[in-house]
């Protein structure tokens, strides 16, 4: 787990980090964050419970417990990742563990949307490319540089042309995915608009 977690804000154009591989198809949201952790009042503590049951069963051998994966921030997965229930706790748990981007063969649609909403880009690659990365990463740590504008990931002598929905890409590059920051940056325009709307004015005169 990354002890220096900071929530992403604004424009996202570049992501650099160490990869962590999670091998297996159809890894669902209940495995990512078990249902008993959904009762939390806030998302602050869900990062430490990510893959709780899988990690307990593997007794320290789960990728998220290996020393070599400490402070990893780019998750490499296989197909249909994030399937199952639509719980937004799943991407929140991954983000608060330290994940900043996910590269996989395919993603469940709702999980993908939930990731985009909190600033986690999800990229796809062909099966062979994913397997090549996972195989390489099994032997030594792989550090990737992701250029979101070019949809390109590179590391040493490796280059991968990533695929991402154009609408999602535009939101990250412009910062539009982050509604709060967008509102704060345009506070003056919002105030002016409010002042121009007659139905927002009220009077106590009867």
Question: Where is each model-derived feature located?
Answer:
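Fe-S-dependent hydro-lyases/dehydratases of central metabolism
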Residues: 1-206
